[in-house]
Amino acid sequence: RRFSFGVLYAKNWPAWRGVDASGAVESGDYPAELNQNKNLLWKSPLPEKGCSTPIVWENSIFLTSPADGEDAVLGFSMNGEQVWQTTIGPERKGRHLNGSGSNPSVVTDGANLYALFKSGNLACLNMAGKILWKKDLSSYGKDTLYWDFGTSPMLTSEHLVVVLMRKGNSWLLAFDPRTGELVWKKERNYQTPPECDHSYATPTLIKHQGKEAILVWGAERLSAHSAKDGEMLWVSTGFNPKQKKNWVVVGSQVVAGNIAIVPYGRGT
């Protein structure tokens, strides 16, 4: 596995899909073509195959990877030099040839890094790679997703939020980012056709009536929860009216103003 950089974006990219979880950037003069021979600035080897996307904070790049049977977080300089590598705990390998136990992206508040893995390992590190705390979330149930756990952690103004969405063991969890202490938890289990309760989507932070809320997409439902205590504020259903099986939630929702764009099913 190699990590390549073709564009250096001046602003921070602190989480999966960037600042507002849209994956979009301001308009500008960016290369329209990226390949091994054109606009490639550098590439750096990684320990093993992982599927997390990198995040960027100031002059550093962070991502996850398996490393000799362990879950690891890596820090790089902006010229591709690996600065540090920290192992968190034993990895749980991907189920498939192209799978990985290191799919969720790291998230940062600018002071610390937060990383989550298929194994259930959840850790907080400082920007130099020192572990400040870590937890084992396997007590909430093993990952049973066919294509390996991929939901990234997210931050609210107060909490580190983790969503686990799979058959029979789906949870919305909030932790104190300073200590790792569990602040609140909410079950999120629904009866669905086979595999329709599997979700790889990452939650989104929104505003609801002037207060922070967490938007969660999975199990054929888009739900909003209070960021303070996890209580459900509203839920939208009817995404699979014919109750077809194997409609898995893969793509994360995108919020534009007061509209949530929700990809689902086959060609919808």
Which ranges hold each PLM region?
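Noncatalytic, solvent-exposed loop/strand surfaces
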Residues: F3-T268
